[in-house]
Amino acid sequence: MYVRIVQDLIRELGKLPGIGPKSAQRITFFILQNPSFDIDRLSETLQSVRKQVQFCKVCGNFSEEDECVICSDPRRDRGVICVVEEPKDVVAIEKTREFSGLYHVLGGAISPIDGVGPDDLNIRQLLQRLADGTITEVVLATDPNMEGEATASYIARVISAMRIRVSKLASGLPVGSDLEYADEITLGRALEGRQYIN
């Protein structure tokens, strides 16, 4: 149907999340039919991202430095940490402009079916951050699905003895969805109306 190299490109693009065979084919045809599209720049940018972006040593968010721009910003409220599953959740919450504290990225959620337990997440690092006594509140902003709820419950239970207020996003987020798909207004209201667990 297509020459081998075109099939290879479609197959490789199709490995990206959210890109099915039709989208991969459309992107491939766009690249082939638009000689003004700077494919070299795209390639260089992809390679630069792979080489230069790392995880923040403090919170686990994406960063070009050892500390991300949020952790190194002196204007952030250092008494509140919002716990999220993935860096994309940080982006979603930042878009609301409702949260001015720090973040902690777990790197996923507890999922026994997928073989992911608490030790596979950045929970130990969270507990180390909480141990210094400067944090007064932890906002649990995990996805409103079974794995997210299990993760939030586990973290709330583990830190319950630390005398730190624990809150959870208010309802209003669709159950079973991901934070990244929530609109800014809904997510902002969920932050504003967060419910305290302890």
Curated annotation (Swiss-Prot):
One of its GO terms (molecular function) is DNA binding. It comes from the Bacteria. Pfam families: RecR_C, RecR_HhH, RecR_ZnF, Toprim_4. CDD domains: TOPRIM_recR (cd01025). Residues 79-174 form the Toprim domain. Keywords: DNA damage, DNA recombination, DNA repair, Metal-binding, Zinc, Zinc-finger. SUPFAM superfamilies: Recombination protein RecR (SSF111304). GO terms for biological process: DNA recombination; DNA repair. A zinc finger (C4-type) spans 56-71. InterPro entries: DNA_Rcmb_RecR (IPR000093), Rcmb_RecR (IPR023627), Rcmb_RecR_Znf (IPR015967), TOPRIM_dom (IPR006171), TOPRIM_RecR (IPR034137). Belongs to the RecR family. May play a role in DNA repair. It seems to be involved in an RecBC-independent recombinational process of DNA repair. It may act with RecF and RecO. PANTHER family: RECOMBINATION PROTEIN RECR. This is Recombination protein RecR.
